[in-house]
């Protein structure tokens, strides 16, 4: 029986018909304790999902659908290393990287031992650099760490580093290079000193074009200063699942950190791919980061579905995507330090859930995934919240609020007020009675107020979740990221798709090689479609290679 034929799914269709014409204002008016009942706290996070177009029966039916998809079994498979891809290879075992409390796995003991060894290696290097004992080619201490990677090899560490900057030990600084455009590299290193700069090259396969090209640029940049190749070897580290390729590139074996094949790039910040972060904030704080994620892992494994934060977050997304036909979801963090979180979550969701084939190879017959995007509040209020408030689409929003930036900082009350104000307005709207009252109180005549009111009405009934961190620290950040990882995994289980591959992006990479040869005037262009051929010819014409 397919997903859409299951009894819970059919019941959800009827429930959608029942609720689609109701307004959330009425839910709150009829239930004064709705905000209390539809909220929970776990792993250092507070989650309010009361401003959603659901009642308790909806939640029950969504949970039944999850059970019908064998979610309990699939959760345990995630934590036991029993998930495999179409080739039978283990995937999705990233949760093992943060099992900090008495590793209790009954299988994969070798993986656990390797993780422990990796922890020790990361810890030792972190201490050496932070204490100034790791030297460059002129015997000066390292001050700048440049992470070269792309996708998950860059987005995760960069996002987490920016979020945890108050924990970075001066004078250490981290920088991140990912783009093939050489501007990214040269603008990043322009103010750096080669004598005190360490490059960390992160690539699972160590064949990633963008990463290797930037690594080559790093080599040239260092050689201009050091003159001798043997002098710059201490300025390179590699994180990879292909250590032999890293060694061939010129990385010393002792400077190569393991990235296992069963760790996907977008789930790799917990591994040595987070080396730059571990060095910057120190091993103790990095371990707190792992502990926070582990706390969310434990909650995810143990809590009942209707009290389970990642599961509820996923089921609500399923509700809007598959029944309200939402095509997009927004993430709005109200903290400057979380500026890169929307980009990170965009990749996590869209690369994991952008699939049209089920696990058995058959076609998907229901919508999967959505366009996930966002920006910082309050900046976003002055750019695109207008679409949320008075547009015509259903766009679920996750608001993420931080009460305090750190133990020493002041409460972020103005930010919190704006965040809560947006969620309340999305839910209740601004009806004609309220608009007219406010306009008349401003001294506007009734007839003119009637005309103006039409343009100021806000229908409301737009869904949102609010996630609150008491303080943004390594523990709470780890918990927050694990929350969304598990949310995405639950969605993949219900849709019966593989969240741990991304084959779609490979074809474009292959074609780029052929097109590059054509742009270098080395190959026949007859294999390209007429549009691509015309574009190639236009580029060549501008370059002066064609009349």
From Swiss-Prot:
Its EC number is 5.3.1.9. It is an enzyme of class 5 (isomerase). SUPFAM superfamilies: SIS domain. InterPro entries: G6P_Isomerase, G6P_Isomerase_C, Phosphoglucose_isomerase_CS, SIS_dom_sf, SIS_PGI_1, SIS_PGI_2. Belongs to the GPI family. The keyword Plastid does not apply. PANTHER family: GLUCOSE-6-PHOSPHATE ISOMERASE. One of its GO terms (biological process) is gluconeogenesis. Keywords: Cytoplasm, Gluconeogenesis, Glycolysis, Isomerase. It catalyses: alpha-D-glucose 6-phosphate = beta-D-fructose 6-phosphate. Pathway: Carbohydrate biosynthesis; gluconeogenesis; Carbohydrate degradation; glycolysis; D-glyceraldehyde 3-phosphate and glycerone phosphate from D-glucose: step 2/4. The active site is at residues 351, 382, 509. Gene3D superfamilies: 1.10.1390.10, Glucose-6-phosphate isomerase like protein, domain 1. It comes from the Bacteria. One of its GO terms (cellular component) is cytosol. PROSITE patterns: P_GLUCOSE_ISOMERASE_2, P_GLUCOSE_ISOMERASE_3. The keyword Cell cycle does not apply. HAMAP family: G6P_isomerase. It is found in: Cytoplasm. One of its GO terms (molecular function) is monosaccharide binding. This is Glucose-6-phosphate isomerase. Catalyzes the reversible isomerization of glucose-6-phosphate to fructose-6-phosphate.
């Amino acid at each position: 029986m397919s997903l859409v034929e299951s009894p819970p799914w059919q019941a959800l269709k009827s429930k959608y018909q029942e609720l689609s014409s109701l307004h959330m204002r009425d839910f709150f008016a009829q239930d004064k304790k709705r905000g209390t009942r539809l909220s929970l706290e776990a792993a250092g996070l507070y989650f309010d999902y009361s401003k959603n177009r659901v009642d308790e029966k909806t939640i029950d039916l969504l949970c039944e659908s999850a059970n019908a998809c064998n979610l309990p079994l699939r959760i345990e498979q995630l934590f036991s290393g029993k998930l495999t891809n179409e080739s039978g290879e283990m995937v999705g075992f990233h949760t093992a990287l943060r099992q900090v409390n008495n590793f209790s796995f009954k299988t994969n003991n070798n993986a656990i031992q390797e993780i422990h060894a990796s922890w020790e290696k990361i810890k030792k290097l972190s201490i050496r650099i932070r204490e100034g004992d790791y030297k460059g080619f002129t015997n000066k201490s390292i001050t700048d760490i440049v992470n070269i990677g792309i996708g998950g090899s860059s987005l995760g560490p960069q996002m987490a580093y920016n979020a945890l900057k108050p924990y970075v030990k001066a004078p250490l600084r981290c920088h991140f290079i990912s783009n093939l455009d050489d501007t990214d590299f040269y603008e990043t290193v322009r103010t750096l000193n080669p004598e005190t700069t360490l490059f960390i090259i992160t690539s699972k396969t160590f064949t990633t074009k963008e990463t290797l090209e930037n690594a080559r640029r790093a080599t040239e940049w260092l050689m201009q200063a050091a003159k001798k190749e043997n002098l710059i070897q201490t300025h390179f580290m590699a994180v990879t699942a292909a250590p032999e390729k890293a060694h061939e590139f010129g990385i010393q074996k002792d400077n190569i950190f393991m990235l296992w094949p069963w760790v996907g790039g977008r789930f790799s910040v917990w591994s040595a791919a987070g080396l730059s972060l571990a060095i910057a904030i120190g091993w103790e704080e990095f371990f707190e980061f792992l502990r926070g994620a582990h706390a969310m892992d434990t909650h995810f494994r143990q809590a009942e579905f209707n009290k389970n934060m990642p599961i509820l977050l996923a089921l609500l997304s399923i509700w809007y995507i598959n029944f309200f036909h939402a095509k997009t979801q927004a993430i709005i963090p109200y903290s400057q330090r979380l500026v890169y979180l929307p980009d990170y979550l965009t990749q996590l969701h869209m690369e994991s859930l952008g699939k049209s084939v089920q696990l058995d190879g058959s076609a998907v017959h229901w919508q999967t995934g959505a366009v996930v995007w966002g920006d910082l509040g309050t900046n976003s209020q002055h750019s695109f919240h207008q679409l949320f408030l008075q547009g015509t689409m259903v766009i679920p929003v996750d608001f993420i609020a931080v009460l305090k930036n750190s133990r020493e900082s002041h409460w972020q009350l103005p930010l919190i007020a704006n965040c809560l104000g947006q969620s309340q307005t999305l839910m209740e709207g601004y009806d004609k009675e309220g608009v007219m009252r406010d306009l008349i109180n401003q001294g506007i005549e009734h007839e003119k107020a009637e005309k103006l009111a039409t343009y100021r009405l806000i229908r409301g009934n737009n869904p949102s979740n609010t996630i609150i961190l008491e303080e943004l620290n390594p523990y709470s950040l780890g918990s927050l990221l694990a929350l969304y990882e598990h949310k995405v995994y639950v969605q993949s289980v219900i849709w019966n798709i593989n969240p741990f591959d991304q084959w779609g992006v490979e074809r474009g990479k292959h074609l780029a090689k052929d097109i590059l040869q054509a742009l270098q005037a080395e190959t026949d262009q007859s294999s390209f479609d007429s549009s691509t051929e015309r574009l190639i010819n236009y580029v060549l014409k501008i370059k002066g290679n064609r009349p």
